[in-house]
Amino acid sequence: MKISRQAYADMYGPTVGDRVRLGDTELWIEVEEDHTHYGDEVKFGGGKVIRDGMGQSQRCDDAVMDTVITNALILDWWGIVKADVGIQKGRIAAIGKAGNPDTQPDVTIVIGPGTEIIAGEGKILTAGGIDPHIHFICPQQVEEALMSGVTTMLGGGTGPATGTNATTCTPGPWHIGKMLQAVDSLPMNIGFLGKGNASLPEALELQIKAGVIGLKLHEDWGTTPASIDNCLTVADQYDIQVAIHTDTLNESGFVEDTLAAFKGRCIHTFHTEGAGGGHAPDIITACSKDYVLPSSTNPTRPYTVNTVDEHLDMLMVCHHLDPNIPEDVAFADSRIRRETIAAEDILHDMGVISMISSDSQAMGRVGEVICRTWQTAHKMKVQRGLLPEDQERGADNFRAKRYIAKYTINPAITHGIAHDVGSVEVGKLADLVLWSPAFFGVKPACILKGGMIAAAPMGDPNASIPTPQPVHYRPMFGAFGKAASATRLTFVSQAALDAKIGEELGLDSPLSACKGVREVRKRHMKLNDACPHLTVDPQTYEVHADGELLTCEPATELPLAQLYHLF
């Protein structure tokens, strides 16, 4: 029996050779492999395949999945693949062909009476996003981020304190303990950064043992060469990551002095372009170093006609500056440079800047990491055309893989949590996001947290079916009760795990320690490992990579924007 390619796609989703447009962007991805079998696909519904004795087996052993996502198009750094995905005990158990091995050939994912089905036909499946630059200013950020497709948040803070409004630090054992207790039942994986600004080790060691996953150096607390060296020395001893916001004013040294203080040790440089803070005007040159793991924050993603004006106002508020003080205004002006922001777009497209994050409520929007990543990819496609790696295929597969890695696997590797999260791979926590292609990158169809549906668009609860208006994002059962704690992870240091802080604080959530952090280098950043020689002209701020000028025009309109939102 034969059916048309269009009819097949309508019924089971796209297959090898089909192309899918991502939202209203100019990005197209092509299916590379299909692990389902033509004629033996499984699908749920009246008169469909997953019924007793057909696609559903009688088995109830350990091989049977708790949940199967059928016929999904997986988009991840490692490939663009059509497959069924099996989930067991909250983790991804298998990727392949689902069904009943008693009636179908080559089944690798067993469906039984105890299996729930989520229809992935015609949908794109991605890993939950990881935002590694969070100011924990308010708990409502968690819901906002979750509804956008983010399932892991790393950063620091204690609420709307003046220090937290400006810096991503949860300082001291008492605050760390209280914040660990506060997030224990939130439907989000969370890891906290302690304050790393100290010239002696003891205060940093106390914070690591109290439960942070890393330390943050911030210029507002004094990011001097001495504090950098001390913080990295302690981090090496405890195998944790250090994140840094460098010295915009160049008071304690220039970018060369900061790089010298790193001494070749790995470090996560926040908003490495510099608008979010850092040595003016040339912190962007740090991207050249193999030991620097660079990220952007989303307000400069991508460069548009509104970017510069918006940033000046944001900066005055976030860093407690006074518009009546000339020195404060000069400080703000020094950080916002059209030339380096334009170059940032291109450096992302070249795979030089490895990650994208939010800088939530502190010059960044927690719910826009994913959409701004894809807006950047779209802008670069329009302005620069296909990447060399995509020329033969004629679709944007490599570019799509490069950009999705920026908010999934690369932050996971950087912070030593890739054994648990960051990709759609067997053994990892089933933090998964389903998207309708028309809404890709901006409005998820379903968000799974640890194998349970934690959030989704839902219609009137009193309606006779799930779809009547008003449809809006609502927390689902995975976000309530003890299930919320059981399907999330709190990321800590191995020292904190050894100190049994979970028992000491009475935490319900499982704890997971970061590992293998200090060996990470830029070459480990998936599809984003380029290290060209970068220079910044101190007068014009023009950026060159290996002698080539990096510049582009600001966007006047973007996809994934007003078309999808009423306000």
From Swiss-Prot:
It is found in: Cytoplasm. InterPro entries: Amidohydro-rel (IPR006680), Metal-dep_hydrolase_composite (IPR011059), Metal_Hydrolase (IPR032466), Urease_alpha_N_dom (IPR011612), Urease_alpha_subunit (IPR050112), Urease_AS (IPR017950), Urease_asu (IPR005848), Urease_asu_c (IPR017951). Binds 2 nickel ions per subunit. Carboxylation allows a single lysine to coordinate two nickel ions. One of its GO terms (molecular function) is nickel cation binding. Substrate binds at residue 218. Residues 128-567 form the Urease domain. Ni(2+) 1 binds at residues 133, 135, 216, 359. It is an enzyme of class 3 (hydrolase). It catalyses: urea + 2 H2O + H(+) = hydrogencarbonate + 2 NH4(+). The modification N6-carboxylysine is found at residue 216. The active site is at residue 319. Coiled coil: none annotated. Ni(2+) 2 binds at residues 216, 245, 271. Its EC number is 3.5.1.5. GO terms for biological process: urea catabolic process. Its cofactor is Ni cation. Heterotrimer of UreA (gamma), UreB (beta) and UreC (alpha) subunits. Three heterotrimers associate to form the active enzyme. This is Urease subunit alpha.
